[in-house]
């Protein structure tokens, strides 16, 4: 996979990020209600506005954006959101590359906790997160997130913990 790389995203990547999120979540659309699906597949204008909230990364293969992830700082720690890999690029190590970049950045912030939310039916995503040191924290209720139950996961990072 020597032709795959990860870099910090720029506002010019907003349309590609929106496209990747739509591609990745459309294949599991039936698990979301309309409001939740709109939240996980924001339009490029929403993506552009998020650049003030924290860093975003894109993964590329041969110059084409195939994955994305972003990070915001919250009272509870660093919140990982919008992790997605195009269905055509899954199982190629793109998720690992994105997590590596995110973890490297996280260590530099001095904050130690990264947390995320995923859905129970996304067993592949959960397995990838667990492989990279994330652990289940709690189940979330449908009342907490747009009518869709999920689960919270976390990882503690520091110079000695980065994989």
Residue ranges and their predicted role:
Residues 5-19:
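A short beta-loop-alpha structural element at the N-terminal edge
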Residues 9, 83-85, 118:
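Hydrophobic adenine-recognition pocket in adenosine-nucleotide-binding enzymes
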Residues 48, 112-163:
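C-terminal "cap" of GNAT-fold acetyltransferases
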């Amino acid at each position: 996979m020597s032709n795959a790389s990860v870099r910090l995203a720029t506002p010019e990547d907003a349309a590609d990020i929106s496209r990747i999120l739509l591609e990745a979540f459309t294949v599991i659309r039936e698990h979301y209600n309309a409001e939740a699906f709109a939240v996980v597949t924001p339009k490029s204008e929403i993506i552009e506005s998020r650049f003030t909230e924290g860093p975003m990364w894109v993964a590329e293969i041969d110059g084409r954006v195939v994955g994305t992830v972003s990070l915001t700082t919250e009272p509870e720690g660093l919140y990982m959101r919008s992790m997605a890999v195009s269905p055509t690029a899954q199982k190629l190590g793109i998720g690992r590359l994105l997590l590596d970049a995110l973890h490297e950045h996280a260590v530099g912030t001095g904050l130690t906790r990264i947390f995320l939310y995923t859905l129970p039916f996304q067993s592949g995503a959960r397995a990838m997160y667990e492989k990279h040191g994330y652990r289940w924290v709690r189940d979330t209720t449908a009342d907490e997130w747009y009518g869709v139950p999920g689960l919270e996961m976390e990882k503690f990072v520091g110079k000695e913990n980065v994989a």
